[in-house]
Structure formats: C-alpha cells, structure tokens
C-alpha cells in the first residue's frame, strides 16, 4: 500500500472503481502523461481506469511515496508492470506520468 496519502487514495479509488473518490483526490485540471504523450484526463481516466475495470497492486515506491511501480490490470491491456510518478499540491494530485515499469 502506498505510504503517501494522496497516492494511496488514488490507488484505493482505482481498485474500488470509485469515480467520485478519484476525482476528489485528482485535480480537475490535472495533467496525465501516458507513455510520453499528454492525454485528456477525463477521457483517459474513463477509458483506462473505469470502463476497463482497472486494478493496481503497488509493489515498490520511492522514499517520498510519489513514485510507484505497480502491477496493473485492465480489460484493454491485461496484466502489465507500470511506473507512476505523481505530482501533488496541497490536498490534490496535480498530475501523473505513467508507462511501462
């Protein structure tokens, strides 16, 4: 389980498939970069996390808890190892970068 409370809330929301919880922790104007390409956050979250039933199992994290590697599963990609780097400001995640881990 991630040690940083915002990252933990993000992972918990994904695993619970709780869109309201995710958008509580993720800034409305958050940036999402997936495999080097900036994506529309609302479209990406819906496609990659919710309509595809995503699950994340964090297997390693940085000392500050803002970078994690996770076993990720969704109905699009199946099981893949992923890396996530989160940027936070105050009570929200301002953005994240993800890709193969």
PLM regions: where:
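Generic helix N-cap/helix-start motif at coil->alpha-helix transitions
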Residues: 2-3
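Short, well-ordered alpha-helical segments enriched in acidic and aromatic residues
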Residues: 6, 16-31
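Amphipathic alpha-helical repeat scaffolds
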Residues: 8-12
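Conserved short acidic donor-positioning loop in nucleotide-sugar-dependent glycosyltransferases
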Residues: 14-17, 36
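Surface-exposed, charged secondary-structure patches
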Residues: 42-89, 98
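Polar, enzyme-active/binding microenvironments
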Residues: 92
């Amino acid at each position: 389980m991630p040690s940083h409370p915002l990252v933990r809330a993000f992972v918990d929301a994904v695993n619970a498939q709780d869109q309201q919880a995710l958008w509580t922790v993720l800034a409305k104007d958050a940036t999402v970069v997936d495999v080097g390409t900036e994506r529309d956050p609302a479209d990406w979250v819906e496609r990659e996390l919710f309509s595809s039933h995503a699950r994340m199992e964090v297997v390693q994290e940085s000392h500050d808890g803002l970078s994690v590697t996770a076993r990720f599963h969704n109905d699009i990609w199946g099981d893949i190892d992923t890396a996530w780097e989160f940027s936070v400001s105050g009570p929200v995640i301002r953005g994240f970068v993800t890709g193969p881990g």
